[in-house]
Amino acid sequence: MAQPDDALRLAPEILNHYREADEAGRLGRGSGPLEFARTRDIVLRRLPARALDVIDVGGGTGVHAAWLARDGHRVELIDPVAEHVMQARDASAQRDAPFTAQLGDARNLPFGDERFDVALLLGPLYHLPEPADRAAALHEAHRVLRPGGIVFVAAISRLASFFSGIRNGYLDDPRFFDIVLDDLVTGRHRNPTGEPEYFTTAFFHTPDLLRAEVEAAGFRVEAPVAVEGPALGLAGFAERWNDDAWRRRYLERLRDIESERCVVEASAHILATGAKLA
């Protein structure tokens, strides 16, 4: 049985950030709809055409678990934040295609070996600043996957704070400028300011480091791809996104160039896909 969330060894500021944030609504506002649409598209293009056993590690309030269950997959969600698990269970109970949700730690999954066909890690890596913890989470995903199973691993780009600062005017704050410098040099994102817009303790990857970490866990890895791409730097992005024709064109073209290095590095999130060798 998973232990209460304050025993799951996440930094207190991370737990507090998610307890206070509206994680359930995040992918429905701002740049969230683009992140959701692209993540879903990337995953769908790589899933086998059959019902699958899926573990959604760090699955939050169940935004991705919900559509996967609706598509006919059997989904088990794990998250270290008790509030997220309760919201995920409530969301599941209101759906015709339910999924399960429980407290758990990405570094110590409460399942036996070779239990799942697919593992989603769409958040754990960037809230595990220590390399050993990220390695443990990836090895756990490898352990619970069946031979030939697929892992999807999301990371925040090393340049994400810099682009966010340009877009939102945060670079005018010298404290944020120092945060960006630390991100670029070390990948370690720390926010001593108390400003929630500056995010919480995290680790930001380069594409090469993300690929290397997933490979080190025993996966055969595709080149990481951009999730949002460069659109978040566009003035008036929300208005453009609500234009059906513009949105369709952007998503079509981004799919064509999603693995180009410059596009990957310009994206706030990047996604690696790995396969467990049979």
Regions found by a protein language model. Give the residues of each.
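Conserved class I S-adenosyl-L-methionine
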Residues: A2-R50, V63, W67, Q87, I150-D183
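Class I SAM-dependent methyltransferase SAM/SAH-binding core
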Residues: I55, G62-N108
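A short SAM/SAH-binding and catalytic strip from SAM-dependent methyltransferases
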Residues: V118-A132
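Acceptor-substrate binding/catalytic loop of class I
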Residues: L128, G194-D208
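C-terminal lobe and adjacent flexible extensions of AdoMet/dcAdoMet transferase-like proteins
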Residues: E213, A217-A278
